[in-house]
Amino acid sequence: MKLNQEFDCFKEYQNFIECNYNIKALSLLENTSKTKLIECSTGSNYILKSTKDNVIDKFNYLGDLGLTNIIYPELNINNNYVTDYKDTKYYIAPFYQTQSIVNEKKTIDLFGELSILHDYTKFPRQLTPRNSRYKFDELTKQLDYKFKLLEEYIRSLETNFITKETMFILSKYYRILDAKKELVRLQRRIILNIKDHESVDYVFIHNNPKLEHLLYVKGAKYLISLDNGKVGINSLDFAKFYVENENINVDIQKIIINNLQNSDSDFYYDYFRYLVLLIYIKRININSNFYQMMVEFELAYNSIEKYFYNFIDKIVEEENNNIE
């Protein structure tokens, strides 16, 4: 019975693909929760991916700007990137085998392709308190809530008998407090930029810059999985990029800091650092499993420690200038 259902399901998808894309599917294999691998008799395989309503606008926007370093979906018979099927939006894109490129090389290349995406799509926009207040109020509420939960958890440890394990967590907590202090300092600087109505470049950001979202095809490099992309500030892409690849042995000073500090404004670098710490704090999963909490605090401590190591020169320079 199950085999019959699977066969019927395949036939439905096969008809959908052939009718809308003139592609004859020989098989349809689960690839991820959102994608299926389409195997064809021609040897040119494809990915079928469920997506969002506004993806078509994103690909049209990038195509109109002439972006050539992204993998575009195949056009259907109606000359659209996205097709409706059973109340779901789908697109089909060429499938390429993952290349055996070392992570250090892929990290450098991914940053380069993100920079190309940003440069092609940038346009100036003035920061305004009215447009920025809601975003910062929301981020501040999220941080305040998480710091409150962390403080309550630490107090619960301190009120009980202190053990070697609880001391381990307590010894890591001070770095989280350092991050809190740094977030407040950076937020004040960013708010000053906003109050000054500073003009900054907005770009199309990938918004999910992982190494697996960079493909190598016959010597060329392409970005994929731009479904969550949006117009924003490049600092967000670079913050997610840094957090995702912080443990890879590459020169962060060369590939990120110099890029952000070469701009006319400190806003990009400040916002990048703010977002990195924001991600670190938000991802701490507070739960009732004591040994899991030891792991959570260890991970947070190591990440924040590395943050201050990577960005300490800039921070010290700023503080010294303020003293002078």
Where are these regions (language model features)?
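Gram-positive cell-envelope targeting signals
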Residues: 1-4, 9, 58, 66, ...
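Charge-rich, low-complexity terminal tails
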Residues: 181-184, 298-324
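Active-site activation/catalytic loop segments of kinase-like enzymes and analogous catalytic loops
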Residues: 234-265, 276-310
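Juxta-kinase regulatory segment immediately upstream of eukaryotic protein kinase catalytic domains
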Residues: 1-25
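A glycine-centered beta->alpha junction motif in the catalytic cores
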Residues: 88-102, 151-156, 280-299
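ATP-dependent phospho-/nucleotidyl transfer catalytic cores
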Residues: 129-204, 310
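Active-site acidic catalytic loop and adjacent metal/ATP-binding pocket
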Residues: 35-39, 73, 184-236
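ATP-binding pocket architecture of kinase catalytic cores
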Residues: 41-129
